[in-house]
Design a protein with these regions (language model features):
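Low-complexity, disordered linker/stalk regions enriched in Pro/Thr/Ser/Gly
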Residues: 151-284
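Surface-exposed intrinsically disordered loops and tails
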Residues: 27-30, 64-86
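Short, solvent-exposed loop/turn segments enriched in Ser/Thr/Gly
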Residues: 33-41, 119-128, 170-171, 207, ...
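Acidic, turn/loop-rich segments in luminal/extracellular domains of secretory-pathway
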Residues: 1-2, 76-150, 192-206, 214-219, ...
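Acidic, Ser/Thr
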Residues: 43-60, 176-182, 261-266
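Extracellular interdomain linkers/hinges and stalk-like, low-complexity segments
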Residues: 1-59, 127, 131-152, 233-234
Length: 284
């Protein structure tokens, strides 16, 4: 608690009145793909009743507790982002709002810190400190932690089989998933996000698969989608005949014209030929 002299705070200590907070990505919507401004109610779990007010903010990066407490002794009178000079531990712009919350502008977060956190730790958690003033004028301080979920995965078909490698028509539904945070769990959904699992089963025909990652702290990324058509049904054998059976007989298969008449070919299919019993195939 702070002691006061003539109503001015001169010291502060970490006591139970102000309680540490953890704001998850599920609560704030903050992800590496959505670094927006959110408003954090840090006093929701603090003691002190209705008379308490949010007094000051700081990055929480002071090297000693004494220095941190000193930094929080100065009251923040600004109530707008434009005039606040406070930042979180990793660069988010923070300020006290007119209704007693903390404005948190995540667009200012250090991009290198975010990337390194996901790649090495497997999660990204920012923080800042705050002090509350109780009804009797005393101060109490705590730390607020803010989780940032990892980026949406990079998803593509591992093998786009068939005549085109870019038409998303394939006989192989294996997905290639990249951009995964260290230790994260990959999840898939085939019902537009209603249910998630660590694997999926594609169906014959059109598929839309959502893919997300869950970091080691339990924060879910935004989802990426991959749309493809799965075709594992073998085409029916085509009908084949000589286009021209020349000579004295039109049915003896003795001809001087090697052109074939191929029928019953599936739309979009590629016709291939083999002259060595199927050991090798080509389009002519």
């Amino acid at each position: 608690m702070a002691t006061t002299s003539n109503g001015i705070a001169v010291s502060i200590s970490n006591t139970p009145q102000a309680t540490n907070d953890v704001f998850t990505s599920a609560q704030t919507g903050l992800t590496d793909n959505a670094l927006t401004t959110v408003y954090l109610n840090v006093m929701a779990n603090d003691l002190g009743g209705a008379a308490k007010t949010l007094y000051s903010l700081d990055s929480g990066t002071e090297v000693t507790v004494a220095l941190e407490q000193t930094a929080l002794l100065t009251q923040d009178t600004a109530r707008a982002e434009a005039v606040s000079t406070d930042y979180s531990a990793h660069g988010a712009h923070i300020w006290i709002t007119s209704d007693g919350k903390v404005g948190y502008d995540a667009s200012h977060l250090d991009a290198s810190w975010l990337s390194n956190s996901f790649n090495t730790l497997g999660y990204a958690q920012d923080s800042f400190t705050y002090a509350i003033r109780l009804g009797n004028g005393t101060l109490s301080w705590a730390t607020a932690y803010v989780d940032i979920a990892p980026p949406a995965p990079v998803v593509a078909l591992a093998h786009d089989t068939g005549s085109s490698a870019t038409d998303h028509i394939t006989s192989d539904c294996t997905l290639s998933v990249g951009g995964i945070a260290h230790g994260a769990t990959i999840q898939y959904s085939t019902d537009n996000g209603a249910h998630w699992n660590t694997s999926f089963s594609a169906v014959e025909g059109t598929n839309t698969v959502l893919v997300r990652q869950i970091d080691v702290a339990g924060n879910a990324s935004a989802a990426s989608s991959c749309c493809f058509t799965l075709d594992t049904t073998a085409a029916a054998a085509p009908g084949v005949a000589l286009a021209v059976d020349s000579g004295s007989s039109a049915v003896d298969h003795v001809t001087n014209v090697g052109t074939l008449n191929v029928t019953g070919v599936e739309s979009g299919a590629t016709v291939q030929y083999s002259v060595d019993g199927g050991a090798h195939w080509s389009t002519s």
